[in-house]
Design a protein with these regions (language model features):
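Hydrophobic beta-strand residues in large extracellular and virion-surface proteins
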Residues: 26, 40-46, 60-62, 125-131, ...
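Bacterial Sec-dependent N-terminal signal peptides
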Residues: 1-25
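Boundary/junction segments of secreted and surface-exposed precursor proteins
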Residues: 18-38
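Low-complexity, serine/threonine/proline/glycine-rich extracellular segments that form mucin-like
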Residues: 36-83
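Extracellular/luminal low-complexity Ser/Thr/Pro-rich, glycosylation-prone repeat/linker regions
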Residues: 20-25, 146-163
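A surface/secretory-pathway sequence property marking extracellular, secreted
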Residues: 66-106
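Low-complexity, intrinsically disordered segments enriched in Ser/Thr together with acidic residues
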Residues: 99-141, 147-149
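A short, structured loop/turn motif at beta-sheet edges
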Residues: 31-38, 66, 129-140
Length: 163
């Protein structure tokens, strides 16, 4: 009989400086513990992104522990009052400056491809993941990293670049 998997750790982490992000929330439906084959929906909201030195939000990367499989996007982040463009789900992207990204959503700015969106948020998104088949407890960690256009190489005057 398969053992019930447990969450080794669950973390919604961010690479953007805490002075750039605020009002985060997340839910997992259903709540754990999980067994192989369980499908979990994650809803995440970043309430506000305040870029320093005109630093704009550019991407949300989703990092999963080895116990998850079948990452599927459901709800794309909005772009309230932001730059012309759209959010694109991408499994892997290398930005012109060499920064590797993915999987997750990245903003495609139609006015300047190297820039993110000028929107301050809120940014709400959701995705589904499945507990992988296994007989032993596996790492079911989840983290969401927020990247700005300074980190991705499209802008070079930001206070959050080195985070």
């Amino acid at each position: 009989m398969r053992k019930v998997l447990f969450i080794l750790f669950l973390l919604i982490g961010l690479t953007a400086s805490s002075q750039c992000i605020s009002n985060q929330s997340s839910t997992l439906i259903p709540a754990g513990p999980y067994q192989p084959g369980d499908v979990v929906t994650i809803n995440y909201t970043l309430g506000d992104f305040t870029g320093i030195n005109v630093n704009w939000i550019h991407a949300f990367q989703i990092n999963l522990g080895v116990g998850w499989t079948n990452l599927t996007p459901i709800l794309t982040p909005g772009n309230p009052f932001g730059s012309a463009g759209f959010w694109l789900w991408d499994l892997q992207n290398t930005y012109p400056g060499g920064f590797n990204f993915g999987p997750g959503w990245r903003f495609v700015n139609t006015g300047n491809a190297g820039w993110g969106t000028s929107s301050d948020g809120p940014f709400t998104m959701s995705f589904q993941i499945t507990v992988a088949p296994t007989c032993t407890p596996d790492n079911l960690s989840i983290s969401i990293e927020v990247f700005d256009d300074c980190l991705t190489g499209g802008w070079s005057n930001g206070g959050c670049c080195n985070d």
